[in-house]
Amino acid sequence: MNAFKLSALARLTATMGFLGGMGSAMADQQLVDQLSQLKLNVKMLDNRAGENGVDCAALGADWASCNRVLFTLSNDGQAIDGKDWVIYFHSPRQTLRVDNDQFKIAHLTGDLYKLEPTAKFSGFPAGKAVEIPVVAEYWQLFRNDFLPRWYATSGDAKPKMLANTDTENLDQFVAPFTGDQWKRTKDDKNILMTPASRFVSNADLQTLPAGALRGKIVPTPMQVKVHAQDADLRKGVALDLSTLVKPAADVVSQRFALLGVPVQTNGYPIKTDIQPGKFKGAMAVSGAYELKIGKKEAQVIGFDQAGVFYGLQSILSLVPSDGSGKIATLDASDAPRFPYRGIFLDVARNFHKKDAVLRLLDQMAAYKLNKFHFHLSDDEGWRIEIPGLPELTEVGGQRCHDLSETTCLLPQYGQGPDVYGGFFSRQDYIDIIKYAQARQIEVIPEIDMPAHARAAVVSMEARYKKLHAAGKEQEANEFRLVDPTDTSNTTSVQFFNRQSYLNPCLDSSQRFVDKVIGEIAQMHKEAGQPIKTWHFGGDEAKNIRLGAGYTDKAKPEPGKGIIDQSNEDKPWAKSQVCQTMIKEGKVADMEHLPSYFGQEVSKLVKAHGIDRMQAWQDGLKDAESSKAFATSRVGVNFWDTLYWGGFDSVNDWANKGYEVVVSNPDYVYMDFPYEVNPDERGYYWGTRFSDERKVFSFAPDNMPQNAETSVDRDGNHFNAKSDKPWPGAYGLSAQLWSETQRTDPQMEYMIFPRALSVAERSWHRAGWEQDYRAGREYKGGETHFVDTQALEKDWLRFANILGQRELAKLDKGGVAYRLPVPGARVAAGKLEANIALPGLGIEYSTDGGKQWQRYDAKAKPAVSGEVQVRSVSPDGKRYSRAEKV
């Protein structure tokens, strides 16, 4: 055969191979397109599978608790016979078993799983449904446990979402819960919130007349004397704001204009002054003010600029939502209860945009909240630009379907395969700081470490690989966060492997931390607000499979998940660098590494001129006291669940010299549901609900007292006491972890309006709050130290202020807050309805939601057949969830 013939044959072979490859790729894409049209239905079968024949312990379920779920995939198109496919999905619960031998499910990382066919797979027949029963760990008590945007892949085809899961409307693919599927145990004493049970719950609330709210300020001042006359703001206000820097003065003027009170020279005069010498004793603190509102003018005297700003916010608090323009004349003396009144926002798990952050800061300022704890990094995302380390945002700032994770992190939390994410540029972050500074808010940046660091670890590995390939070995290792000798088998709280933890024993880890602190500190300086507090993070540096809910198969204990714990390691256990440090006596053991690292980071913090470090308390648990750290002050976010012993352990931290910022999950975690109803959003490991009333009733400076006013996770009473001294809390912070909020409106729904209850409790100590007494035991349902009548009266006032006045202001601020679902019943053929925040409008429908009518409690409508109810925002633009009575 001559050369020409060989060449022609080679070209023909190559062409056929190319065409074959094209054909294969087209076939893969066709298969993915077909799979994307499968309709998913998720149905909860049994949240207490262990009581009904499933051996959860043998399956290795934490605390031997598991549930059963049914996945149904319906095929309305042509038969699908191909086996070379994967469907990816997200779940906060570990899959323990698949009860259909045609399918298998494997865990990838975090909440990402893949569903694949086995050799026994017989296809998805045309016009038929295939059922896949699954056993998963724990419980799935709220429908948001079932995440959207399942997606299919095959070969090199472009991934594609299952169409009916590409939504935030869970009704499209998650079946309603039925019966007692919402219960965690058969003895669960929580009350399922329905229109009927809400009607009972709201029975002690009524709409107060406007006169009863006259002169009421939120948050409540220390002392107020309301006078008979009114001040008229209908011609606007003439503001003397010379005591404030211009950005703060502009904020005040803009707030008046937003609420319908124009700023003009012929308006009602409001004068301001700063006289620190006028304030004595407990009043001589930042933010204190005196306010005199007369018929002809008002005067605000502040201890400092913050005091002037807050006094003006108190005037704004009085402005009615109906635009009438008249406010009560009064005298007030006021000062904050705590120096730290905070909101924590996680933008790492799911990113939230700059505009949403600014709206949050607006509302924080209006309600005198002064600390913005900004969670900028976690396993699932890195959200701030760091000059010199572009990989942090190029890789760690976005998620997509890249199994190698060289261009992005893998998808999490139901986002789908497409590129998702975002980050704050250097200028964005400076803008946010300036915006906060103008509103008397300190920005506290948090870069979480040594655990919850996967985004940083993966990003720095991408950097390492790139520079290593270029032969720049020294530069490649400069900021590397892993010890390549470490083969530890660990599982983090949210099911990541050892990549979740940066290695605290490496010099390169310290260089990385120093670099990040330095760059962020420089941004703060340029913004005019030098960092006062650096947040170290520090939480959850552990292997959950070595936790109390698991037991080793060699000596199994009842009530626990049985696993082979001999294969489990503590974080960094097999790191040769860490092993050497322990041998040299630099640290006692692996358990002490997080606290050791916190001490080392505190030296870097101090070197950057930052006087205070803060952390989640478990990250510092092995340090002897706050004096073990280089900074002169150390704060802890105390997040022990109160009914599991937090009422006592909190004292230990205060007595060791830490500034305790009360952050208890069961009261002030705003990522938990508002009520016990499967249609609400949120995680619920600490409590099944935290509504505005529960947060309002929280006593942050006397933890045991809360046993009389609340229940545990299962709705049971509990007892609480501590025999230890209690020096007092430094502050109160409400947290929004963002795993369950993929959009900005979802974020705002979870924060507001309960953040207003946080503002009330952090600024004002109520008369019904008891002084802490060592040794006093509060027994839920038995003791009655708390004046519950005073508490209920106080809540009635506050609930009416929210419903009649403050929610309308949130409307004007563009905030997508949660509207409560009404309580309702039909009695003698007439609809009776009520609401948790009196003053909000209620609507009802008798035709399946096609038409809605306003409910009038004074003329209860006659109804028959199916009736639905919902509440409506004061501006008439938004509605609560509608429910059948």
From Swiss-Prot:
Residue spans of biased composition, Basic and acidic residues class: 875-885
Catalytic reaction annotation: Hydrolysis of terminal non-reducing N-acetyl-D-hexosamine residues in N-acetyl-beta-D-hexosaminides
GO molecular-function terms, A-Z: beta-N-acetylhexosaminidase activity; polysaccharide binding
SMART domains tied to this protein: CHB_HEX
Active site: E540 (proton donor)
A single BP term in Gene Ontology: chitin catabolic process
GO CC terms in record: membrane; periplasmic space
UniProt keyword RNA-binding present: no
Disulfide bonds: C56-C66, C400-C408, C505-C578
Pathway(s) served: Glycan degradation; chitin degradation
Signal peptide start-end: 1-27
InterPro entries noted in UniProt: Beta_hexosaminidase_sua/sub, CBM2/CBM3_carb-bd_dom_sf, CBM2_carb-bd_dom_sf, CHB/HEX_N_dom, CHB_C_dom, Glyco_hydro_20_cat, Glycoside_hydrolase_SF, Hex-like_dom2
Start and end residues of each stretch annotated as Disordered: 866-885
The keyword Signal belongs to this UniProt entry's keyword annotation: yes
Family, per entry: Belongs to the glycosyl hydrolase 20 family.
Subunit description: Monomer.
Name the record gives this protein: Chitobiase
Gene encoding the protein: chb
